[in-house]
């Protein structure tokens, strides 16, 4: 007769019927800043007790999944905000049975009005410079050992007025890179893991700092790819703000990257650029300034899949800057001769990256970014 005891398991029928308790409820008020969204609310506070000037404050709330919280239950995007530069008066996140109710308080000045960047058709260059400064300050907080990834959209979500811009809650990750292997004893020890004694039972998930086939260039490609992705987010956010139509680079459920690029077509001034000069702008179209390099945009559309598969970093983290084997016809890095009249991948990729760097520099010059606020070049 066996003495082994049977494991106690929950009744599956009971677990299926389990309804979690939600400790808070959101108001039914619709968000007039984002009338097409079902995941946010806005409430105007009149005669608020905390407002000595008796003005109207705004409470904005965004509801999203708790998968966008870090290991300490803090929203990832908050790692890039600082109280000194944050234009919101206050922020508070509530956990609610698998959901996060992320609230922020706005205290407008007299005659100040906030609105969404979507289909705003903004033409005021001073306002656009303020938005650009907010974007570069926000993304400038991403460390050289971190990777910022936006899920489900290709821009930084903001509300803004003519005086300031406020970063809204983001469906985003901030991934940490693993410590690089080093033989030097002079360098400070790398401490990015779980602190003891908790590291005896859990370990942190990190982005690999090296690849078994790529060598030292791999980390350089990773940083270049992240730089290009961040500058594309800046471009796409500015484009969203100055358009009177929806951002054409956002992929809907019934579309794909190839459909988006085919619909936009090629710029009549440069067939290597995406045609954005004929979109519906709030003011006069800025010439061909907003037409991005086509080759990089294609790679960015592949790179954004990393946000949907955050643990597949070796597939995506260096994707944009890594030379493509397709250009060589064989994949050998030792052969530099042309194949079918095409440049070798190691030759054409730097030209593509340089084209993007020139595009970003022209964009920053046009919108008047101060030299200290510009992202570092490739």
UniProtKB/Swiss-Prot annotation:
Superkingdom: Viruses
Pfam families: Baculo_VP1054
InterPro entries on file: Baculo_VP1054 (IPR008416)
Entry protein name: Uncharacterized 42.5 kDa protein
Organism (species): Orgyia pseudotsugata multicapsid polyhedrosis virus
């Amino acid at each position: 007769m066996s003495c082994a005891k049977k494991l106690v398991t929950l009744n599956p029928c009971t677990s299926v019927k389990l309804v979690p308790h939600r400790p808070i409820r959101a108001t039914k008020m619709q968000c007039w800043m984002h009338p097409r969204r079902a995941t946010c609310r806005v409430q105007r506070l009149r005669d608020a007790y905390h407002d000595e000037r008796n003005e109207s404050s705004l409470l904005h709330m965004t509801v999203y999944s708790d998968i966008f919280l870090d290991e300490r239950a803090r929203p990832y995007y908050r790692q890039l905000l600082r109280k000194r530069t944050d234009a919101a008066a206050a922020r508070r996140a509530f956990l609610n049975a698998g959901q996060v109710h992320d609230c922020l308080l706005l205290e407008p000045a007299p005659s100040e009005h906030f609105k969404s960047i979507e289909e705003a058709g903004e033409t005021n260059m001073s306002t656009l410079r303020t938005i650009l400064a907010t974007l570069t300050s926000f993304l400038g907080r991403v460390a050289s050992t971190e990777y910022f990834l936006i899920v489900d959209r290709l821009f930084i979500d903001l509300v803004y007025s003519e005086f300031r811009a406020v970063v809204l809650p983001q469906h985003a990750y901030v991934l940490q890179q693993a410590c690089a292997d080093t033989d030097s004893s002079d360098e400070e020890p790398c401490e990015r893991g779980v602190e003891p004694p908790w590291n005896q039972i859990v370990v942190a998930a990190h982005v690999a700092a090296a690849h078994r086939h790529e060598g030292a260039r791999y980390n350089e490609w990773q940083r270049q790819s992240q730089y290009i992705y961040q500058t594309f987010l800046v471009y796409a956010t500015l484009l969203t703000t100055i358009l009177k139509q929806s951002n054409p680079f956002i992929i809907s459920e019934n579309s794909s990257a190839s459909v988006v690029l085919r619909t936009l077509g090629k710029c009549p001034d440069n067939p290597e650029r995406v045609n954005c000069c004929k979109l519906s702008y709030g003011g006069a179209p800025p010439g061909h300034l907003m037409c991005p390099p086509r080759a990089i945009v294609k790679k960015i559309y592949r790179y954004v899949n990393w946000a949907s598969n955050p643990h597949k970093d070796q597939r995506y983290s260096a994707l944009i800057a890594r030379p493509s084997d397709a250009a060589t016809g064989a994949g050998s890095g030792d052969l530099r001769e042309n194949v079918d009249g095409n440049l070798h991948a190691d030759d054409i990729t730097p030209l593509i990256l340089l084209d993007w760097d020139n595009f970003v520099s022209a964009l920053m010059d046009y919108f008047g970014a101060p030299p200290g606020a510009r992202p570092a070049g490739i």
